[in-house]
Regions:
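Catalytic alpha/beta core of large soluble enzyme barrels
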Residues: 6, 18, 33, 40-206
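Short acidic, low-complexity intrinsically disordered linear motifs used
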Residues: 203-223
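Internal maturation/activation junctions in enzymes
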Residues: 1-32
Length: 223
């Protein structure tokens, strides 16, 4: 089925590229939603399962970023980053997965890898990225899988299944009671109209990148 769907997608792109007189896209198929979009729409990311039924999602913010100060002033639970306490703030958001959602606790590391391999072989024209959570007793089996499929392994990261390995990890499993307690600490309403008062200067200049090839960079003057 995935092979057929990929073929239809590629052929449709080819047909419309010819009609419009443009080049055919290099890659058509991919896995969505992306990590960022999944946070905005409250869904699992790509081919990943949900972290757990209840978990805390931490987000880091640069202290120089206006939205970091804005969020702190609005009362969103925050604490200094343990690695960079002077420059970075860590915000915590309680998340509840939908009822009957598949979580990482429902899948073994090998099942996660096998799903990734199916989409790589039969759907994606590029290498889909995935983070595999591995229990202590699964590492040897995972190592054997990587060795067997070594020539296909790309875009795969591994993390210990335990949440206690890293402080302030991006995803931290919690109980239903802990979820409810943190939920009470969130502000009932965020006044986004006040954000503009924090943005008194352009902080994006340093983050801009130029499209460069060789010794030439493309700069478009929009003024």
């Amino acid at each position: 089925t995935l092979d057929h769907l990929r073929h239809v997608a590629v052929q449709t792109n080819k047909e419309w590229a010819e009609r419009l007189g443009v080049q055919q896209s290099t890659a058509i198929t991919c896995v969505k939603p992306s990590g960022t979009v999944s946070q905005l729409v409250d869904s699992a990311s790509g081919i990943h399962a949900r972290h757990s039924q209840h978990y805390i999602r931490t987000v880091r913010g640069d202290n120089k970023d206006p939205i970091t100060q804005f969020m702190a002033d609005q009362g969103i639970p925050a604490e200094p980053c343990v690695m960079k306490p002077d420059t970075t703030m860590v915000f915590s958001f309680p998340i509840q997965s939908p009822k009957n959602a598949v979580t990482r606790n429902d899948m073994t590391a090998i099942e996660q890898l096998e799903m990734w391999l199916i989409y790589q072989r039969h759907w994606c024209e590029h290498k889909p990225s995935v983070t595999i959570t591995v229990k202590d007793e699964e590492w040897m089996e995972v190592g054997a899988f990587v060795y067997k499929h070594f020539d296909e392994m790309s875009g795969v990261s591994f993390l210990p299944h335990s949440d206690h390995t890293y402080q302030q990890a991006p995803y931290q499993e919690c109980t239903k009671e802990e979820y409810k307690e943190l939920l009470k600490k969130l502000p009932k309403k965020i006044d986004w109209e006040k954000l503009s008062s924090y943005e008194q200067e352009d902080n994006t200049i340093g983050m801009q990148t130029l499209a460069c090839s060789g010794d030439v960079c493309e700069i478009v003057d929009l003024t």
